[in-house]
Amino acid sequence: ARRIAKAGVECDQVPPTKFFDKLFDKLVWKKVRARFGGNIRFCMSGAAALSPDVAEFIQMVGFSCYEGYGLTETAPLVAANGWAGPGKSRLRTVGLVANGVKVTIDTDAWDDPDRADEGEIIVHGPNVMKGYWNNEAATNEVIIEPGVFRTGDLGKLDKDGYLSIPGRVKSQFKLENGKYVSPAPLEENLKLSPLVEQAVLDGRNMKNTYLIVHPNMEAMKAAMQDAGVDVSGSDADICASQTTRDWLLGELKAKNMTAPAWKGYEVATSIILDPVEWSTDNDMMTPSLKVKLRNLLSHHEAEIAKIQG
């Protein structure tokens, strides 16, 4: 880790140069790389936000680790780390825009005065689809003109041209104090906890945010027992217990909901625990495994009302 920090290189592989680094690499990391076949040149991540901690660990093992961004409608690549060469990658971004593609940020689609440089990502280029098959209405919603596609994703371009994606424009919500919250990256952060299987952060038009969590029951019960917390009863009883909820919320506040990933107003003050896994079978997930937020909020309507007071 010190070797990588000293090199000042993000995402790219940093070969060991000093004696003890080489020795440790031979004794430990070489064996880890061998478990993956021994021939991996680099790792790519897409579809969801890549945790910087995960990326840095993969880099420490000895692989370059790059995050990219694209959509089916853009065939698919829009931006990526790694393609521009060594030293041209940046953590917490999806990299530089690909050759032949142009990205603009429509700030009119987003009205948070504290984040005025963010907006909807608009993709321009020959890679943009002509339209959705036999669905002119859906096509007209996203195709501004031929070769120009409205993604629905919230984005920001920094001064060096690196693109970052805080979330979806439509998934953002505003708190009572006027602050906007982008839940997607925060939910991914929560799912790094071994105690959490699925998580949703909400709080639209409320004073504070709250969580709905489907916990890893076995991991949570074991951790609670170690902490001296009673775990008797069924999974439903444990999840309904205020003691359990207070304990898990405290754990997540201490280990996940921390700066710089979380701003103070984003930190949840309440939690609802759902003992049942969200799936397509109970209509809580789409076929592409995205949470059906409306269904989930409706299912927990009574508990949400208690939080609202």
Report each predicted region and the residues it spans.
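Conserved ATP-binding/catalytic segment of the ANL
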Residues: 110-116, 120-175
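Gly/Ser/Thr-rich phosphate-binding loop
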Residues: 1-89, 102, 109, 197
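Conserved C-terminal "lid"/linker of ANL adenylate-forming enzymes
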Residues: 173, 198-202, 249, 253-309
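Alpha-helical "lid/cap" subdomains adjacent to substrate-binding clefts that gate access
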Residues: 1-38, 217-259, 275
